[in-house]
Amino acid sequence: MVVSYPNHERNYCVFDVNKINKLTSKREGALPIIEEKLLSAKNEDDIIENLYAINLLLDNGIDKNKISELYPTLAKFNDSKSPNIQTYLAGIYRKTKIPDAFGPLVKMLIQDSINPPKNSHFDPTEEIGGAILDYLA
């Protein structure tokens, strides 16, 4: 299954649950696999699938510091114009509060405010703005 993107009926992505569960069941052991997949990602599907896996790992209690170590790899996508990539990155940064990620979040928010994403079925600035507020709280 490829990623099913948000549409007029659903404002979130759908992933291959079995594939994601198999990967995230490895917990910390999944991180090198995810990092390699992100470094070699060829398309948005590959990127957001692995960002989603990181979000799930964080939701399941993985040590935030372990995810913070992936920041150099995650930062590769900080300039993305994709609302999907921006939303997943903002979610990760919101949960980890990686200090170096604050500036890129502000940049995303400003860029999206000036040039809102077109053909998006949700507003990524909600997640980005929420992440920024969590940094400031």
Language model features with spans:
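Amphipathic alpha-helical scaffolding segments comprising HEAT/armadillo-like alpha-solenoid repeats
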Residues: 1-5, 25-39, 61-77, 98-116
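Structural detector for internal amphipathic alpha-helices that build alpha-solenoid repeat scaffolds
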Residues: 10-26, 36, 45-64, 76, ...
